[in-house]
Amino acid sequence: MSSGLWNQEKVTSPYWEERLFYLLLQECSVTDKQTQKLLRVPKGSIGQYIQDRSVGHSRVPSAKGKKNQIGLKILEQPHAVLFVDEKDVVEINEKFTELLLAITNCEERLSLFRNRIRLSKGLQVDVGSPVRVQLRSGEEKFPGVVRFRGPLLAERTVSGIFFGVELLEEGRGQGFTDGVYQGKQLFQCDEDCGVFVALDKLELIEDDDNGLESDFAGPGDTVQVEPPPLEINSRVSLKVGESTESGTVIFCDVLPGKESLGYFVGVDMDNPIGNWDGRFDGVQLCSFASVESTVLLHINDIIPDSVTQERRPPKLAFMSRGVGDKGSSSHNKPKVTGSTSDPGSRNRSELFYTLNGSSVDSQQQSKSKNPWYIDEVAEDPAKSLTEMSSDFGHSSPPPQPPSMNSLSSENRFHSLPFSLTKMPNTNGSMAHSPLSLSVQSVMGELNSTPVQESPPMPSSSGNAHGLEVGSLAEVKENPPFYGVIRWIGQPPGLSDVLAGLELEDECAGCTDGTFRGTRYFTCALKKALFVKLKSCRPDSRFASLQPVSNQIERCNSLAFGGYLSEVVEENTPPKMEKEGLEIMIGKKKGIQGHYNSCYLDSTLFCLFAFSSALDTVLLRPKEKNDVEYYSETQELLRTEIVNPLRIYGYVCATKIMKLRKILEKVEAASGFTSEEKDPEEFLNILFHDILRVEPLLKIRSAGQKVQDCNFYQIFMEKNEKVGVPTIQQLLEWSFINSNLKFAEAPSCLIIQMPRFGKDFKLFKKIFPSLELNITDLLEDTPRQCRICGGLAMYECRECYDDPDISAGKIKQFCKTCSTQVHLHPRRLNHTYHPVSLPKDLPDWDWRHGCIPCQKMELFAVLCIETSHYVAFVKYGKDDSAWLFFDSMADRDGGQNGFNIPQVTPCPEVGEYLKMSLEDLHSLDSRRIQGCARRLLCDAYMCMYQSPTMSLYK
């Protein structure tokens, strides 16, 4: 997508700003001229139209033959000014802009925009509306009533519209607010009975339907309507000046909001004369329109090629995109009486054919751009769909079917209007590309009908051949169709279970995952085929691979091909700040989880995504005492996990399973490929038994021998006086109570929180100290006197809890201060010990107050909730520079589907880390917004690094 970034400064006087808004249909990657860094503007972003003041306060069309460009100020990135091609954006009205802007995920925003009916219904949702709310993905929807409608924050030119909903019935207690947002009471309800959501999480409950998701009439509906008076693909003429021009009908329907005006017709002209891009009032009505050759006119201005053209017999209303809105379906479309026919079952092959969501009888097919559905394949695989036409599979058009009167009622709606052919390559050869396993949630262009999302329905577990979602399948044709099953279910109005396949090759007339106006999955355009499940067979080309024996081997199957990640030989340091952010955030980012791997995925992400503290582990040459698979493990970690993660932001489950298999080679280690494990088990096996890493920590207890370990588990009794402890306090308490000291300053310190198992936590919240001062925990290190700041000579453990002297701090004193402190009657019996100091300590350092501090920085936090590990990592210096990672954030398919990892920014964490401990203690955990609750309440391991020490280790 061509675009230009003019500046990153505040847009002020050089531009007029008009209240016109556009949605980006393509992603922009543009260069910031100041920093020379790429700025990513994803598709689905919303921009406000701007005009150079020197041009004037209006839009000026480009010269003929040149591409029109539009200047936009991106609302989510208000300092960026883009100039984009007009074809890469779609204009949206301000009311739609407000509804869409509240949806922060640009892909979900674009998906909702394409569902025109649902978006329009969003305008009807107001205070008092009964709704259902989707609180969490994959869970049931809760009933509620809208109590607030409006912006939460009004800091932009236009603000997103949010809905404050009071949850009812089983939803009570499932919310997170009582109507208060950032200290402001926006509505009132009981505690934890309210939520603030955008339209994408909302569904309007109406008396006459099942909500926003049921706005399209399906084939099971008994309502009958009169079809549009002009056939799609019929030939027509129109007067242009003194001449007559011809074209093909690509749209015939009423316009939304203008139903009283009657039908309008979109005509694809034979000659390049046109003025319509397929949109009306910001809504896409026709995907095949081209502004250079398409016109939109009232039906009275259109001359059919045959003025006496017979009207089609009435049939079930498979409503087109213009008919889908209930409001429009009743205008100018009288009901037609008559019996409806049930397609029934047939012994021979038949096809449904749908265009723009409507069932259409056979007709001349000039442009193969239509979704289609194979109703049935003959039980004998040798019998082909070609029974319907001897020319099937060739480019010539099929013979004209018999008239409607000659068809039986069961066959009336089943015809073959085009030749099914695979799309040729540019060189004329047939395309045989590898399986397309795309799982992107939206298409890059607005080239599909705005469709309703698929209604929830139970998926079939498979058929007699053991096929299920994710299986490689074929439809026995000549030539066969190969693909991956993406969906199994029973659409409304059909008695058979269908399979939705994503085909290997493009096929004329296939969709991008929609069937009869409903989206069941998403793939590239012209690759979605819907066929009866019983007509599918396992892919004969890979018979030896089916079925996959178990979950351990599944991630090495061909079905995982679309999720593979790269191999990178070159050593790669972590990318930080904005550069790292651009690489890492989004869906299918991070490390893909599979089969109880979250403990390992999250630990690796914490250790390597944005830290190089342990990079020496990846570089040490093999020694004679190393295990035989040392090099294999190290190379796998370096080239297939760490380097790809840092460059591309993604590692697939196949690579992680290879590592899990290696872990099981260790004697006394088992279950790493299948069972739930804890991070400490993984670290001990990897670091101690396989890589033989020099222990990260060397700790001495009361003059005993130094003990080596790779992480430190905090053991202590609960202090009832402390509400929210910091990591600094916990570590010092634990060391004081156990009389421990670090024998060496660590370069990487992994601290395990005081909790027992996955469930019992000693503290409800723990404050993750961003900086850890370990000076007082080190042996042979100069330390400051707690009283005067001079060189400390003695340490007293019994003074630790004394409230009169820096309560809760380790106490060390110079000789003079120690004498004075222990003259107090309460401290006369204290036993204090000399502080161990370096033998060659320069005398002038401490006399001039130059006693250095050893500090470590927090770089990651590993969390667990209900046996599932997730990670928080810090990608920059700012307190809000936090990312949240979940290796199993989403799912593609059912039991044998695939997990989709996701990395999301969570800047709200920074705000909570600025709060005082008292405020955090008094804050109800359920009121903590976003991901921050998991960081503060579910911490399992906190990881610190020393920027200076890591240079030497």
UniProtKB/Swiss-Prot annotation:
Annotated positions binding Zn(2+) 2: 796, 799, 822, 830
Stretches for region B-box: 778-830
Entry GO CC: centrosome; ciliary basal body; ciliary tip; cytoplasmic microtubule; cytoplasmic side of plasma membrane; cytosol; glutamatergic synapse; midbody
UniProt domain CAP-Gly: residue ranges: 153-198, 253-286, 489-532
InterPro entries: CAP-Gly_dom_sf (IPR036859), CAP-Gly_domain (IPR000938), Papain-like_cys_pep_sf (IPR038765), Peptidase_C19_UCH (IPR001394), USP_CS (IPR018200), USP_dom (IPR028889)
Biased composition (Polar residues): 327-346
A UniProt-annotated Pfam family: CYLD_phos_site
Keyword vocabulary terms for this entry: Cell membrane, Cell projection, Cytoplasm, Cytoskeleton, Hydrolase, Immunity, Innate immunity, Membrane, Metal-binding, Microtubule, Phosphoprotein, Protease, Repeat, Thiol protease, Ubl conjugation, Ubl conjugation pathway, Wnt signaling pathway, Zinc
Sites bearing Phosphoserine, chain numbering: 384, 415, 419
Residue ranges constituting the USP domain according to the UniProt record: 589-947
Disulfide bonds listed in the record: none
Region (Interaction with TRAF2): 391-466
EC number assigned by the record: 3.4.19.12
Function: Deubiquitinase that specifically cleaves 'Lys-63'- and linear 'Met-1'-linked polyubiquitin chains and is involved in NF-kappa-B activation and TNF-alpha-induced necroptosis. Negatively regulates NF-kappa-B activation by deubiquitinating upstream signaling factors. Contributes to the regulation of cell survival, proliferation and differentiation via its effects on NF-kappa-B activation. Negative regulator of Wnt signaling. Inhibits HDAC6 and thereby promotes acetylation of alpha-tubulin and stabilization of microtubules.
Subunit composition and interactions: Interacts (via CAP-Gly domain) with IKBKG/NEMO (via proline-rich C-terminal region). Interacts with TRAF2 and TRIP. Interacts with PLK1, DVL1, DVL3, MAVS, TBK1, IKKE and RIGI. Interacts (via CAP-Gly domain) with microtubules. Interacts with HDAC6 and BCL3. Interacts with MAP3K7. Identified in a complex with TRAF6 and SQSTM1. Interacts with OPTN and SQSTM1. Interacts with CEP350. Interacts with RNF31; the interaction is indirect and is mediated via SPATA2.
UniProt-recorded name of the protein: Ubiquitin carboxyl-terminal hydrolase CYLD
